């Protein structure tokens, strides 16, 4: 048996905290009866409704996608553009991305139907590292890379400390390849950080998420996470970097 709010969160209906609010507000029914107490536990045979809609309880699944450029990080798009879930049409579960990558950014993206798990991984307090490789205009000096590491002041505030490394440069074309590791998830953050130091991003790819990478995958490929990987991610979701 599991707590009702946990089952609702796992189904992707709402975060656990939001599920608790829905229960308190009398918007949740179990087997046709309104439940307002948070301590209620349910079994797999119990019928759950939220706001009059039946909660479909699915087996949790976890995938890693090598997202191509030109794809929306969403389960659907009202403009009819290609979305990341288009790569998973053969699975019965309704999955969605954990966080997002910009339309023009490629790289590692996780998808799941486990709402509570996704919400925890996206919470900034756990400081999960995400490593990007950017091709930028110009060749930034070491001082500008150190500025990236110390934090860049953006419109909504200063970014957290990061790690920056110059991987290669092309003096003839005046471009550089730079690796940047951050643990925040602001909108278009990496691109804006480079713009702030005067080096526009030409191409951007996320190569790592925590301990996961793209090894063995080509753009558009996906694989299911192993039980061990899921266990490690759960530890990160529960304890952040202190999990290991």
Curated annotation (Swiss-Prot):
Pfam family, one: PseudoU_synth_2
The keyword GTP-binding belongs to this UniProt entry's keyword annotation: no
Catalytic activity: uridine(2605) in 23S rRNA = pseudouridine(2605) in 23S rRNA
SUPFAM superfamilies named in the record: Alpha-L RNA-binding motif (SSF55174), Pseudouridine synthase (SSF55120)
Keyword RNA-binding among UniProt keywords: yes
Residue intervals of the S4 RNA-binding domain: 2-68
Summary of the function given for this chain in its UniProt record: Responsible for synthesis of pseudouridine from uracil-2633 in 23S ribosomal RNA.
Protein name: Ribosomal large subunit pseudouridine synthase B
Gene designation: rluB
